Amino acid sequence: MSILSLPVAADTLARVFAGAVNPAPKAAVRFAEIPGRTSQATIPTRYGPVAATLYHPPSDVGCPPVYVNVHGGGFVVGHPEQDDPWCRYLAANAGVVVVNPDYVLAPRHRFPAAPQQIYDIVCWAAEEERDWDGTRLCVGGQSAGGNLSAAAARLALENCTPVIALQVLHYAPLDLATPTRDKPSTIVARAVLKPWMGEVFDTAYIPDRAQRLDRLASPAWGANADEIVGIAPAVVVTAEHDRLRDEAHRYAEKLHAAGSLIEYHEVTGVDHGYNIMSGALDVTRAVYSRIAGHVARATGSP
């Protein structure tokens, strides 16, 4: 057993990691040419209020749809501003209000706190008294944010509310039951996500290995997706060299079997976090355009 599988070690490293990591996107992929119209909100949840930045479409025309964006960070790093370029892009190109919230993080708040809180935020976004049309609602995220988005969609299915028009799962970890060391990458040691990192994140988030089998933690594992008929339509995007690619592909196949897969798209030549940690502007722009098109079509946005 690795020492990193011990909560006392993983928790310490997770806190160090969270304090040391600067996840600001590379300058080349910041989309500085797209201005942001933003406001602030405080969202009540069962774990207390959370702050959120709201990104508004360029013009006030009608009552726009809404997209809840869930940032990544291995369930332990909390920097929603890392998604600022994406949120500005989506608001401008899909005509939606983007809700970009904080959420509770491990190790202080372990599973299932984060998925439950994201579900609360999605429910809040769907309420009638908002400045947008909550009946045209999407949720999505990249990396850990994609995992939490999938969990929110599962809870919406099980609770029969709210209706989600689209879930977007962008290079998401969808099988926490399988250790990261057992997830291969086509570029081996050069892969962004190192096995030790996955072990730290998973242990800090869910110390009990048995609990990692839960449907909200590992929707792609085993029979967890056998009863998802009716779940929100999904777009699943993976990166060719990402260790998490195969599990996302498995979940896409399960979504397809349930009649809920809109598109599975593998981005060639890139690794985990390519749209933040690299200068791959053309690739990033193409993927953002693809996702924004799906969001616009799902919500009936002009």
Question: Could you tell me what each predicted segment is?
Answer:
Residues 74, 103-107, 174, 271:
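Alpha/beta-hydrolase active-site loop signature
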Residues 79-80, 86, 99-136, 278-284:
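Catalytic nucleophile-loop/oxyanion-hole region of alpha/beta-hydrolase
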Residues 63-74:
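Short beta-strand element of the alpha/beta-hydrolase
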Residues 141, 145, 149:
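Gly/Ala-rich beta-loop-alpha elbow adjacent to hydrolase catalytic centers
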Residues 1-58, 211-212, 300-302:
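A glycine/proline-hinged amphipathic helix-loop "lid/cap" segment
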Residues 135, 150-302:
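Alpha/beta hydrolase fold serine-hydrolase catalytic domain that processes acyl esters and thioesters
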Residues 66, 95-99:
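A fold-wide structural signal in alpha/beta-hydrolase
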